């Protein structure tokens, strides 16, 4: 599994991994943010997906697969996360787009309207779900 870091191109003079050639040769790709203090720190997977499409030649469907199920395979946890299937953790985002291909065209815009982790709502349209405070034990 080739894991590509589209955000690094901002730090290395615009060079990119040959993503299209790798896919055309039959390789499976994963996408990652490469968040670290030394090289272009990027937290946004939306930005990574957009860069993969705009600069590396991936289609929106290829980039989304590389960021989700293929990323889970690269991390060795595809049996638990990476796709919506019975028995897997329901980690998902609801994005404000009418067509999935818009994700790659709206660079720099936060499209997230809802976030769920393990089936529980943690973010909804501008508000963060409150976590119950743990009870303090009296000793």
Q: Where are these predicted regions, by residue range?
A:
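Intrinsic disorder/low-complexity segments
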Residues: 134-139
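Short, well-ordered turn and helix-capping elements at secondary-structure junctions
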Residues: 6-8, 35, 99-101
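His/Asp/Glu-enriched, well-ordered alpha-helical/loop segment
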Residues: 13-97
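C-terminal cap of metal-dependent C-N hydrolases
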Residues: 67, 89-133
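Active-site core of metal-dependent hydrolases
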Residues: 1-14, 122-123
């Amino acid at each position: 599994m080739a894991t590509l870091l589209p955000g690094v191109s901002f730090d290395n003079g615009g060079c990119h991994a040959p993503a299209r050639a790798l896919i055309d040769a039959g390789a499976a790709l994963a996408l990652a943010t490469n968040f670290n203090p030394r090289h272009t720190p990027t937290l946004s997977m939306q930005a990574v997906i957009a860069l993969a499409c705009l600069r590396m030649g991936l289609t929106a469907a290829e980039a989304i697969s590389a960021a989700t199920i293929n990323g889970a395979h690269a991390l060795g946890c595809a049996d638990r996360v990476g796709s919506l299937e019975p028995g897997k953790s329901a980690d998902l985002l609801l994005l404000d787009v009418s067509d999935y291909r818009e994700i790659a065209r709206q660079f720099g815009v936060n499209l997230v309207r809802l976030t769920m982790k393990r089936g529980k709502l943690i973010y909804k349209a501008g508000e963060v779900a409150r976590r119950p405070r743990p009870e303090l034990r009296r000793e």
